[in-house]
Swiss-Prot record:
Keywords: ATP-binding, Magnesium, Nucleotide-binding, Transferase, tRNA processing. It is an enzyme of class 2 (transferase). This is tRNA dimethylallyltransferase. Belongs to the IPP transferase family. Its EC number is 2.5.1.75. Catalyzes the transfer of a dimethylallyl group onto the adenine at position 37 in tRNAs that read codons beginning with uridine, leading to the formation of N6-(dimethylallyl)adenosine (i(6)A). Substrate binds at residues 13-18. It comes from Borrelia duttonii (strain Ly). Residues 35-38 are annotated as: Interaction with substrate tRNA.
Length: 300
């Protein structure tokens, strides 16, 4: 077993990533969570944090790491991950990154995107273009100056649209050229987990029902009672934000909110798989049928 390897285990929400961790041998590996909501303290149920039982079987990092009022971002994740990797390598343990945030996996592999600073003059110019001409105009301009970035970007992500144009107007170089990076770590084993979509839909429905049965409503009432609200970064997670909508629209029934969580979760699964399918050199497995192959790949 090579102890200098780094393992990625990724897949969409509810695919069964945590389930396979119970089969890992104790003491030879630790998990680094790649999740933008599990990182927050107190937001437990809808984020589907690993159970106490699982965390006693294999240590998890970046779970219950941050207070809910603070923004979690790629920079924090990357910095903390590098420290954890270094520590685990000193202990001759395997770092295993587990989660569903494809954006974080991508930049852990290739490094943080680097682009030059932009002057306030250029920033104001692009923002004024957005105010006067709208998002579609900026998208068309991005298509003209950096088609590669235009094809890859979420076309509703106005922050990254503006940022891409700012870099181009500042330097005359497409931001896509700045984002091309070499692998930051050697010997990465990338394991993808997937199931048929009808199976995923059924698992999502069961998961949401289990959230309600486990006391999600009481957890949200408690969080609101502590002063957290829609401005709290942790409330952006699926399963939390829908209940904030319910609070502002009392005409909604509980079943409407449950159905909305299921719908949003399934749409998120589709977006996750679209992103994951673009990652190179991934070994894909069904988490139930291929467990032995997964274990051999990591630990043999």
């Amino acid at each position: 077993m090579k102890t200098n390897k780094i393992v990625f285990i990724f897949g969409p929400t509810a695919v069964g990533k945590s389930d396979i961790l119970f089969h890992f041998p104790k003491g030879v590996a630790e998990v680094i969570s790649v999740d933008s909501i599990q990182v927050y303290k107190e937001f437990d149920i809808a984020s589907c944090k690993p159970s106490i039982e699982l965390r006693s079987h294999i240590r998890h990092h970046l779970v219950d790491f941050l207070e809910p009022i603070y923004e979690y971002n790629l920079g924090i994740f990357y910095k903390e991950s590098c420290k954890i990797i270094e520590s685990l390598r000193e202990q001759k343990k395997i770092p295993i990154f587990v989660g569903g945030s494809a954006f974080y996996f991508k930049h852990l592999k290739y490094g943080l995107p680097s682009a030059p600073p932009v002057s306030e003059k250029v920033r104001l110019y692009i923002n004024n273009l957005f105010i006067k001409m709208g998002k579609d105009y900026l998208l068309e301009e991005l298509r003209r100056v950096d088609f590669k970035r235009y094809e890859s970007i979420n076309q509703n992500d106005i922050y990254r649209i503006k940022r891409s144009l700012e870099v181009y107007y500042q330097t005359g170089i497409p931001i896509s050229q700045f984002l091309q990076r070499e692998n930051m770590f050697e010997n990465i084993v990338a394991i993808g987990l997937r199931r048929p979509m009808d199976e995923m839909k059924s698992r999502i429905i069961s998961r949401v029902k289990n959230m309600i049965d486990c006391g999600l409503l009481d957890e949200i009432k408690s969080l609101l009672g502590k002063g957290y609200d829609e401005k709290t970064p942790a409330f952006k997670g699926i399963g939390y934000r829908e209940f904030l909508l319910w609070r502002s629209r009392p005409c909604y029934l509980l079943n409407d909110i449950i159905n909305l969580i299921v719908k949003n979760s399934f749409l998120y699964v589709k977006r996750q798989m679209t992103f994951f399918n673009k990652l190179p050199n991934v070994l894909w497995f069904h988490p139930d049928d291929d467990l032995k192959n997964i274990l051999d790949l990591i630990f043999v």
